[in-house]
Each structure stands twice: as structure tokens, then as C-alpha cells.
């Protein structure tokens, strides 16, 4: 039974126990419950007794006259008397008779009156209160109406505990009055939804089926339209048919919660409908309208939608619903009888310009909440960046969230103590530790000095904290576009500088940045840079991918490496590259692995290898390696990606590709690379060879791929073969990676020009490109160097120079060996040799 007690009813029981202790009584009787009811002071029972002139002091005096005080204060638990238990049982009956699912202070008072024979009833009679009159007073306060019929209608909820008459106790319990909230300025302003609000007013003014349902994507502002209607009602900006209406939002969760027995939910809903029908001025708003279908429908019961249908059809109940497009189709459209009773009102996603106006209208609320100043540039950045980079949500919700989190972030930063205060704390703690150590060592002079230092540090810290609190905290922090970009960077993983650095400066030096990793391939780097610049300059369809390229040419010339460099330039991380080996998708049925298996097939729940990666990292470079090895059906699926920037996976979800760069690599047309004519280290005819190879590659691509596929590609880039100078520069690049690993061991690696030339000669293969160079460096440099490190022939603190013996740089150099010389680095410490001190340890210079 006690689980049905309201918080105030539980407090009455606690106060009754306290009153019994004050009177030294070892029991809790009806008189103590009466004292607890009056002592509580805020419930319906206390208000009723107060209106009859019954005070706590008067009741306490009467109880002492009738019973007197006990001899000794009780200890431990104080039990209820049988009569007090009966009162609590009667309070449950009173609640059930009134149709309430809880026990409040009013029900306990009604139980006292109904019992009628205890000390509490005697006290009330002695104080001149007629028990019948007290009962009527409680019923009137509960219902807000006069007479028996009104009392029956006013079957209140916990609203009865408010202590003031109310005519909407059921609605107050299971809903919220939006017009009252609008009158108290608790609702955010609604900007630019005049058409939707006007359409809702038109539907509400119909004679029958006057029930609009707001349909739109999550976050576009469906609830805001209803709040705008509530504000219009308060301001009188509605037609005569809607004036003086009260707009309530119904919480279906509260209706269902606590309905333990069959019929409880239906009974609550019927009471809500009865109260709405009795008042006649209520418009009901049901958010997440689809929850009506099946709500409360236990075995043998009917759901909320079936209860509402008759009243909705006859116009007896005016209801505004709100739900998303998917849920409307899934739940409402399946129930044709329910669907025809609602009139759809589409709520579309606002434009970026409209979103900026919405943010300006909300600026005052967020500035007051976070105690910051939000600039116009921050609102423009929030709308534009959210629209560009957050693809799985909708405006204005995602832009508002950016503003909100940026304000919260700035406020938290200002409330965090500066680093120098923490440094003071560390110094003070250190001084105290040293002082205690000095005291333990009985070095009292040092302890006194440390005590003075501690006092000085404490005073300095107090002064710095005073400056911080009077300065930084009083200054209004400003949220600008940079703060918005930082928050967006935390959301999406895009490095902040990629958003805030001037795009023009970055794009103009794009070739320079790419060439830090790509040797040669001027045409390829320029073509990629130009395509990206066109995209970022806004001269490309924003719905298409940022760029789509076919990288063709011989193997080992840098096609994949350029893709990685492009990913690092655009998104700040090599991991932003999604690399897919198309050789794994050579059969028709393997295409499902790429985009997701259809329902009923193995792997349906796992999603596709491509679509899932892009959904998780929508800002990335996608590399389709060796595209010619894939099945033809995959090309057909990629047509939609190349044209519209989107793809539907096996689970029906739309994956957005508009922020990706698509790169297809191919070796078509390069089968003649093994022929000796015009290949290898080219001399004068290199350009003619390249044009001949480029023409053949293009011809082969046209034979292998359909025209509609090639027509959607931004650019086809044929890579050059590598020249001797480019191979030597590539040696520098690869050796620098080995040198960086040696730096960790405090060793420096240097190569002579002859050593580089020999590595280039041995590492380049006209068929395999530059990939064998990596193996050559591993075999000739890394393997030998690792042995010398293990034999301690070279070690930390040395400069290792790699050279070759007996080779003039012109011959084949097949028998020439590399030499490794370790020389100790020049010391940066004082020269001890002049003082006659020679350092020992470490290997002597070794030449092999």
C-alpha cells in the first residue's frame, strides 16, 4: 500500500512519528496522523483544515488534554495502532472510489473522517469542525467544481497535491499546458514557420476531422510549430474559432506507467477524454503520434488509437499529432481508419539562410543560459558547417546543437582554474612536505624558512585567484566561428585547422604539399589539385562526390601513394583512406559484400564493406584498387554514387558520398611495359612514349568500361614512368624513413651520392616500377645495418655513413658492396679532453 503514497503522504507518516516522539507516546494513533497532516502544511488536507480555522497548536493542545504526555520518549520503531492502520486502509478505499491510482494527504484525511471514532475525529468535533463539512471541503478542493457531478468529474491525479483548486487535474498529471508555458515566456521563439502554423489553424478550424498531424524528419521543428501555435493563441493572433483555447501536450508514457491491472490504462485515458469533453476548450498535442498504435494493448485490451478513433472522427476531440516520415508510414498508414482522421501537414527542413535566422532568434536564450556572447559569424558557421559536414541529421537541430555545445564548452573553460593556480597548489604542497621533513630531522631553521615560503605562496595564490575571479569570470566570453569549428571537429573527427585555415591559401599550395610525398607525376598532381579546387570553389554540383578519378598507368609509379597523400591533405590523416581491393569482388554474388547483403541472406546484419565504412567515416578518400578486376555489376551500382553522391545499402539506409573523394586505380593498357622499346630509364623519346601509352590506356578503358561509367568520372589520369632522377629522389624519401627509426636509437644515417645511385640502379625494375626499391633498401641497408647494431659495431651516439667501394657510378655495379662507417657524433658537452679526461665506452669508428 505504501508504494501508492505520494511524497507528501509519506512525509505525513514521518511527521506523525515525530509528533508521537514529542508527546512521548510509544504508538502512532489517529491523533498523530492528524497532527502530521496539519504539520505538512502544503497538501490538500492541510489547506482544507486551514480553511476551516484548525491550527496545529489547537490540535496539539486538544490531544494533550485528551491523552496527555507519556513518561519516557520511545526509542526505535514506533508501531501504528489498529485504528490508525484502519485509517490508512480506508484512505486506500477513498482513493479507489475517487478513481485515483495514488494515496495523497486528502485521502488520509478522508480516511480519518470515515473512521469517525478515533481521537482525531473527537479533536475535530471539539474544534467545531463538522466531519461532513470537512469531507465536502476536501472534495471541492480536489475537483474544482461544486456539487456531486463536478466532484465525480474531477478525479484528479497528483495535481490535487498542489494545494490550489484546478480544473484540469487529470491533464496536469498526464500532460503539460503549453499555453500556460507560453504565457510565462518559457517557450523558445518560433522563427519562420508561418505557413505551417497557418495550415494547422486551417485544419483545426474544420467542422470534422479537424486533427492535423505534423510530418517531417527528426529535428526539423515539428514541436516548434505547436509551440508557435501556443504563442499565437496567447498573443491573440488566431481566428475566433481558436481564441481562449488551451493547448495541452499529452505524455503517453505517464498514462501507461503504473497501470498494473487490466483496464487501468483505458480508465485513465477515458478520464482524460472526459475532462477534455467537459471543458470543451482543450486542444491535445500528442508528440510521437505513432506510439498511439499499440499503446496499452495488453492481451484482451484495446490500444489508445482504437479508443480515440470515434472521437476524432466526430470532431469531439481536437488533436495535433507529430511524427517522422518513416514512423508515419510504418504505423499510421497501416491503420487506414486512423490515417483518414488526421490531415497531414508537411514540415520541411529549413534552408541554411532560414536556419541562420532561427539561430539569431534563439541567440538571447543561449547567451543567457551559458553567460556568453554569440557572434553573427558563429551562427553563420554553425548553419553552413552543420549543413556541409553533418549528414545524418537535419537543420536546424544540428546547428542549434553546435551553438549550444560551443556555449557550454566556453563556459566550462572559463569556470576552470588557470594552470598557474594549479602550479601554486603544487608548490605549496611541496613546501609543506619539505617543512615536515625538516621538522622530522629537527632542522628547525630550515623548517622556519619553509614555513615563511609556504605563507608567501599561499598569499600569492590568493591574490592570483582574486585576479582570476574578478577578471576572467566577469568578462563575457565570446563564441565565434572558431569555437564552432572546434566543436564540429570533435564531433566529426575532422582536424580543426582544416576548417578554419583559409581555403584559398591551402588550395593554392596543394601541389607543393602533395609533392612532399609524391616524386614526379606532375600531371597527376596538377589534375587532382585542379579538380579539388573546382569543387571547393563551389563550381561543382554539391550533391556529387568531391572528386572522382581514374588513376591509370604502370605498376609501382605512385597511384596508391598519391591517394594516401590526398587523404592526408584533405582530412589530415592517412587513415581517412578507405582502401578496397576490387580483386576480391570478381564474381557477381560478391557485390553484396560491398554494399550489404539483402534481407534473408547471410551477412545482412553486418552491412557492406564500403557502405559501413563510409557511414562511420563520411569524410574520407575511397580507393578502389585495380577496378578492372571487379565484376561488371559493381560498375552499375557505382553509377549512382558518381552522379548523385548517395547509395542505398542492403538495409535500406541511404549512405552519403558527397564528402568523399573516389579514386579508381587500373593497370589497363600497360601490358606492353615489359617491352624494351621506350621504357626503363628513358632518354629523349620519353614524352612520345608517354603519349603513346596514354592513348593506349584510354582506348583500353573505353573497351572495358561502359560509356556511362567513364562519363561520370571527373578526370582520367595516366601516370608517367619514373626517370633516373626521380628514382634517386625516391631513395632519399625511403631512406629518410629508415633514418627516423634510427633517431629513436640516437643514431644518424647518411648516404653518399654513389650509394644512392647504386640503390636506385639495383632497386628499379621497368616492369614493377619503384616497389622493388623498398626491397632493395631492406636487403642492402636495413639487413646489414641491423647485424652491425647487434654486433655492436655501430651504436648510439654515432653517425653511420653508407658508401660504396670501387664504383665510378657508370658501370653495372653488380659486385659492388656497400660500406658502413660509424663515427661518434660531436659532443655538445664541455670538452673534457683538454683537462686530460677521455670519455670511454661506445664503439670506435669501424669501416667494413
From Swiss-Prot:
Gene3D superfamilies linked to this entry: 1.10.8.60, Clp, N-terminal domain, P-loop containing nucleotide triphosphate hydrolases, UVR domain
Annotated ranges, domain Clp R: 2-144
Binding residues for ATP: 216-223, 553-560
Domain of life: Bacteria
Keyword set, alphabetical order: ATP-binding, Chaperone, Nucleotide-binding, Repeat
Region of interest (I), ranges: 171-418
Example GO molecular function: ATP hydrolysis activity
Pfam families to which the protein is assigned, alphabetical: AAA, AAA_2, AAA_lid_9, Clp_N, ClpB_D2-small
GO cellular component: cytoplasm
PROSITE patterns listed in its UniProt record: CLP_R, CLPAB_1, UVR
GO biological process: cellular response to heat
Segments of this protein annotated with the region Repeat 1: 5-70
Region spans: Repeat 2: 80-144
Protein family (similarity comment): Belongs to the ClpA/ClpB family. ClpC subfamily.
Protein name (Swiss-Prot/TrEMBL): Probable ATP-dependent Clp protease ATP-binding subunit
Record lineage: Bacteria, Bacillati, Actinomycetota, Actinomycetes, Mycobacteriales
